[in-house]
């Protein structure tokens, strides 16, 4: 029989052992430190809302039952003070007085309660002599005994600890709670904005037999039931287009996607993605909708379109946004004309001139053709400099296999990327719906894979079969929710996700 580590581990911190012993004593005395339920009548926020202007040093006859986490406590001889915190961050003072509860109940509070405990307090609403809205207890109860002490201050937590113990971070840092609620508001506002425009939300497979819809390396798993390898999806695109073939007019999906690639301040292997598809629209139409939705989301989740960053800089996302074209903007910064006809040798010569600090991927990838070279050069010379919201449009054909060729400009496709603060935030297409051309594009990708191109898209015969039933012209967009919140707040991707992936502690 395995020994209980709580009973045998002498290396436990002293505070842990003290609190564990209190738990054991409460149980021995018949006082459950983890009761199944309590009779809470009000949240802390409801108490504050009900008594906004209670006069200093006054009392009411109103009785409430409240619960919260003890984040501050001060014990004196005949009167104890504590600050309780609710899940939304609301604080409220409670007072335990000898005259009100008697010596036994007061002494139990002093002995049993530690910072971090969740307690229930029953009593009447008053205002203290200092004017602090409070609940004067006539009884109290332990609701959940905390065996681990909270950090004294947020600064005590390292960045790694904040990520690993986000639950503690949420307790001690108000800004973390604010960002978590902003994320909820962002997702709610996106759904509301799309539904108001007639979009229907659908669900498509997370597990797929082919990894398609984007150029990315997938996570691979195996189905024991089917005895085949499956892939965590890298994008929902190809299934959403099947919905368009089947007759949906406007669809969207907001859910998780997975890419087995690097993790840094702007990338995560698992992230939330919004994709939308609208029939009989072009990439110009989807750019307008994307701008409007982001502005509406800022209104709802942040409360302003003047985005205040942690470094005190301000980004204005109101009004119309600038639009530039990839080839002309790259030509302007390089000082020479770059077109879809510019040779690979010339592009590599430019990369060599710029140096490894500008384009390491270019120098280390001999398989890169014209399109990848142009995109990499543009990203390093133009994209990273775009602070204000900017649409860059008209991409090389070979890097956009699912996109319609431009109506009037040879060698480019009708695609835009949206940049804000130097980060790609969203992308939009006039979708390719010619099944013959789509098959040719997939063939080019397969050949790229044969040339050791890690991010080539697989040939999806089932998707091609769907296109052969005729898909109406449409426009599609994709936007990372994590990056949207990054753009709205100026935070890193790990700070916008409640529980980002971290390497587990070794034993």
Curated annotation (Swiss-Prot):
Coiled coil: none annotated. GO terms for cellular component: cytosol. It is an enzyme of class 6 (ligase). The keyword Metal-binding applies. CDD domains: LysRS_N (cd04322). NCBIfam families: lysS_bact, PRK00484.1. This is Lysine--tRNA ligase. The gene is lysS.
């Amino acid at each position: 029989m395995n020994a209980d580590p709580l009973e045998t581990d002498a290396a436990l911190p002293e505070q842990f052992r003290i609190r564990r012993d209190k738990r054991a004593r409460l149980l021995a005395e018949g006082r459950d430190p983890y009761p199944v339920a309590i009779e809470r009548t009000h949240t802390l926020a409801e108490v504050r809302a009900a008594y906004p202007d209670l006069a200093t040093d006054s009392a009411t006859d109103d009785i409430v039952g409240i619960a919260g986490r003890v984040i501050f406590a001060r014990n004196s001889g005949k009167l104890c003070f504590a600050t309780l915190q609710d899940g939304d961050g609301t604080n409220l003072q409670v007072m335990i007085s000898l005259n009100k509860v008697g010596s036994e109940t007061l002494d139990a509070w002093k002995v049993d309660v530690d910072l971090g405990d969740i307690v229930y307090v029953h009593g009447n609403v008053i205002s203290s002599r200092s004017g602090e809205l409070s609940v004067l207890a006539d009884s109290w109860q332990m609701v959940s005994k905390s065996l681990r002490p909270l950090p004294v201050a947020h600064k005590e937590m390292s960045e790694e600890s904040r990520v690993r113990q986000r639950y503690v971070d949420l307790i001690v840092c108000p800004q973390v709670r604010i960002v978590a609620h902003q994320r909820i508001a962002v997702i709610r506002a996106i759904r509301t904005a799309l539904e108001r425009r007639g979009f229907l939300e659908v669900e498509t497979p997370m597990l797929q037999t082919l990894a398609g819809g984007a150029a990315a390396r997938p996570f691979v798993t195996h189905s024991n039931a089917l005895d085949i390898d499956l892939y965590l999806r890298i994008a929902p695109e190809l299934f959403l287009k099947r919905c368009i073939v089947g007759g949906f007019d406007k669809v969207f999906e907001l859910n998780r996607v997975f890419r087995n690639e690097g993790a840094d301040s702007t990338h995560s292997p698992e992230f939330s993605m919004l994709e939308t598809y609208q029939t009989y629209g072009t990439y110009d139409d989807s750019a307008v909708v994307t701008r409007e939705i982001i502005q509406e989301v800022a209104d709802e989740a942040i409360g302003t379109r003047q985005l205040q960053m942690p470094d005190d800089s301000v980004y204005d996302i109101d009004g119309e946004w600038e639009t530039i074209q990839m080839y002309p903007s790259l030509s302007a910064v390089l000082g020479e004309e770059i077109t879809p006809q510019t040779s690979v040798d010339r592009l590599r010569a430019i990369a060599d001139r710029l140096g490894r600090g500008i384009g390491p991927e270019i120098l280390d990838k001999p398989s890169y053709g014209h399109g990848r070279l142009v995109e990499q050069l543009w990203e390093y010379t133009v994209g990273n400099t775009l602070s204000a919201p900017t649409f860059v449009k008209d991409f090389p054909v070979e890097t956009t296999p699912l996109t319609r060729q431009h109506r009037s400009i040879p060698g480019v496709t009708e695609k835009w990327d949206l940049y804000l603060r130097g980060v790609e935030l969203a992308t939009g297409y006039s979708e390719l719906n010619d099944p013959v051309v789509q098959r040719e594009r997939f063939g080019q990708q397969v050949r790229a894979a044969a040339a050791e191109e890690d991010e080539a898209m697989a040939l999806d015969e089932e998707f091609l079969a769907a296109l052969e039933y005729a898909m109406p012209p449409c426009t599609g967009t994709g936007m990372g929710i994590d990056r949207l919140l990054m753009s709205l707040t100026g935070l890193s991707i790990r700070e916008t996700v409640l529980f980002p992936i971290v390497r587990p502690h070794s034993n």
